[in-house]
Amino acid sequence: MSRYALIVLIVVVVAANLCEASDCGPNRVYKSCGTGCPETCENPDPDCDRACHQGCFCSKGLLQDIDGNCISPDKCP
């Protein structure tokens, strides 16, 4: 019975991670090890710790605006 429970647990964890990755929204990508200091219009080159943070981040080359949207740097106010 414990082997069955382990298989179910693995399937649930994998499914949860796949759901998170698809819920990022436009111009965002899911990373299992991203920065805790996102690149923003206000701070495009943040100095941050190297700790891994899991979640959705702006796609490469985009910055996060004040509303949390990912935009190209030339669109920053």
Swiss-Prot record:
Keyword annotations from UniProtKB, A to Z: Disulfide bond, Secreted, Signal
Compartments (UniProt record): Secreted
Disulfide topology: 24-56, 33-52, 37-48, 41-76, 58-70
Domain TIL: 24-76
One Pfam short name: TIL
Main location as per UniProt: secreted
Expression tissues: Expressed by the venom gland.
Record-level GO cellular component terms: extracellular region
Top-rank taxon: Eukaryota
Endpoints of the signal sequence: 1-21
Main function: May be a phenoloxidase inhibitor that stabilizes or inhibits venom phenoloxidase while it is stored in the venom sac.
The family this protein is said to belong to: Belongs to the serine protease inhibitor-like (TIL domain-containing) family.
Protein's UniProt name: Cysteine-rich venom protein 6
Organism expressing this protein natively: Pimpla hypochondriaca (Parasitoid wasp)
